[in-house]
Amino acid sequence: MKRLQNTLYVTTPEAYLSLDGETVVVRNDDDVLGRVPLHNLEAIVSFGYRGVSPALMRACTERNIGLCFLSRHGRFLARVSGPVQGNVLLRTEQYRTADDRKRALPIAKMLLTGKLYNSRWLLEHFRRDHPQRLDLTAVGAGIDQIKSSLRLLPEAADHDMLRGIEGSAAKAYFSVFPQLILRNAQDFPFSGRSRRPPLDPVNAMLSFAYTLLGNEIAGALESVGLDPAVGFLHTLRPGRASLALDLLEELPAGVVKRVLKNARPETRRLIN
């Protein structure tokens, strides 16, 4: 059983991280900003540009502590990891399955089933808890469309059909998404999902949360010997962690709930 530890987030751009014995030291020039015992950590995420000492990098790779670098705006830059772990036969089978679309299809269906189920759950949760603040007819129509998409998934003959079903469900989901912004809606307008770059504060928060979560998933995949770049749903592309994105598909509902809960004017100022 894996013991859940803490993640150290270093948000000061000028910070430099080093190792003092068994302690991570965060410095800004001569000022010590913090000291954290290494054994309490399972990951370090740095938004700085000054870097990390080689000694700390080595300690992290030896102890399987994730070390991730993001830009000050939250864009993923790099992740440091140790030697590939796990059984090479596991990765070989992963590659074979991903290369055989018929074998990959059932896995892709399971991933999308989880995504659509959780999307439906989120809408039903808001409909149940906030009936006076929603257009129940529109939200109900969105839920019904997602249910219809769930019924169609088992019959999909290929990945193109899956993407079509997913697209219909996503359109229904995001058509009612603005209603889920119950707090400070005037400060957080939402006109649809946008990426690279996100075009509004809500999209910026979603993309940032997905970046952090995707990094965690990629590290977990590497720790058990799987290749994060070789997935079964997302197409393979250089530089893309396709398998991490596959697994991320099931999780946005929980992320969205937290993002909406923390939609405050001061958050918008931080994003801007």
What are these regions (language model features)?
Residues 1-19, 29, 89-272:
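Active-site helix-to-loop segments that bind/position phosphate- or nucleotide-bearing substrates
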Residues 40, 48-121:
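A surface-exposed, charged beta-strand/loop segment in the N-terminal or early-internal portion
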